[in-house]
Amino acid sequence: MHYFYRMHVTRYQQAPSYEAPGHSKVASLRLQGQEVSPSRNCWVGLSHYLPQGAAESASSNAEKIYVVLSGEITVITDSAEATLAPLDSCYIAAGERRTVINRTNAPATMLVIMGYLPTGS
């Protein structure tokens, strides 16, 4: 098997926007993976949450990592609630239900790293 190693750069100004299902008052950009780069294991998005912006309670078959870059984001699961400040991070297991909300009056930005769904999901 041959692997071709090639760096892939996505410039912020050229990152495509995408609609994240179940999100309101959230603008999302795809930075890596999916249609942007050949990443085989995960994709990376950047989500800008306006005040009271939210991702409704949902789960998926892929694990997720959230890293807050600016502002504050509250992540709620069935077993815990945590408010994340800049450079705080959070792991959400595959199948774990979560709600994400910006409860502040200032915008918040979060990096989203998500594994691809297992084949057949």
What positions do the PLM features span?
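Residue-level recognition of conserved beta-strand positions in structured domain cores
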Residues: 59, 70, 77-79, 102, ...
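Conserved short histidine dyad/triad with adjacent acidic residue
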Residues: 30-33, 43-60, 94
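Short beta-strand His + acidic residue motifs that chelate non-heme Fe in jelly-roll/DSBH
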Residues: 55-57, 75-76, 92, 98-105
